[in-house]
Amino acid sequence: MVDKLTHLKQLEAESIHIIREVAAEFDNPVMLYSIGKDSAVMLHLARKAFFPGKLPFPVMHVDTQWKFQEMYRFRDKMVEEMGLELITHVNPEGVAQGINPFTHGSSKHTDIMKTQGLKQALDKHGFDAAFGGARRDEEKSRAKERVYSFRDSKHRWDPKNQRPELWNVYNGKVNKGESIRVFPLSNWTELDIWQYIYLEGIPIVPLYFAAEREVIEKNGTLIMIDDERILEHLSEEEKARIVKKKVRFRTLGCYPLTGAVESEAETLTDIIQEMLLTRTSERQGRVIDHDGAGSMEDKKRQGYF
């Protein structure tokens, strides 16, 4: 009986139902894999949904080439251990133009390497449904997004042209060229995610745990020195301000656009305790969310995750 399930078990059952529904309803679904904690939980739920069989769809990473090195190592390890069918896509036009977050800024870099890259990959493989790990508690534009988020033939999201979702009934009807973005974790919170990771023993990128790391403060955000490329874009005065601090990440993206937070949380229980006390959004460290008022909604209207 549903009323005997714990809060997390109810969320788990809802997410598994959504994942199975998509697998049964759509011709060519794909699971977007950004390597972060939400992707880890979503992938775990998908494997549970079809256990002991394999996933009936591939996972796809839209690579900007600016993720943390630990994220790439973790991705490759998980793919090998789980036997996943991984598709990686890098926007060739962005690479040819040398697009990067330093020279071109966060907005242009995100649009070309993430949004346009995603649209290219979806078109190339003809996917009609794409799972994403977004949650409604993350950000205000995501709070009004449906579980089945309808996208037109150009992958655009129109918040005024979405379908009603009553109880657990979802309308997946699409015409040729249209698609659905599916968010099985819509009703989860950041705390739910961490508690589930703890209870299920889900592996995550070590960057989520506090450790001594080299960082530089830029515009009030602690940016980690992840590889040599960032040094090419720092002045000598800025290089002199590089310090070691005990930090961790609440959210992961392109490393020059993702801020760390000072923390002592070295274990999952520490992180959960920290989440119980925090009053700030996990996305406060995402530079792309501060490009302008309504910037996330604008990005989603153009086809962003």
From Swiss-Prot:
GO terms for biological process: hydrogen sulfide biosynthetic process; sulfate assimilation. Pathway: Sulfur metabolism; hydrogen sulfide biosynthesis; sulfite from sulfate: step 1/3. CDD domains: Sulfate_adenylyltransferase_2. It catalyses: sulfate + ATP + H(+) = adenosine 5'-phosphosulfate + diphosphate. It is an enzyme of class 2 (transferase). The keyword Transferase applies. Disulfide bonds: none annotated. Keywords: ATP-binding, Nucleotide-binding, Nucleotidyltransferase, Transferase. Its EC number is 2.7.7.4. It comes from the Bacteria. Pfam families: PAPS_reduct. GO terms for molecular function: ATP binding; sulfate adenylyltransferase (ATP) activity. Heterodimer composed of CysD, the smaller subunit, and CysN. Belongs to the PAPS reductase family. CysD subfamily. With CysN forms the ATP sulfurylase (ATPS) that catalyzes the adenylation of sulfate producing adenosine 5'-phosphosulfate (APS) and diphosphate, the first enzymatic step in sulfur assimilation pathway. APS synthesis involves the formation of a high-energy phosphoric-sulfuric acid anhydride bond driven by GTP hydrolysis by CysN coupled to ATP hydrolysis by CysD. This is Sulfate adenylyltransferase subunit 2. It comes from Pseudomonas putida (strain W619).
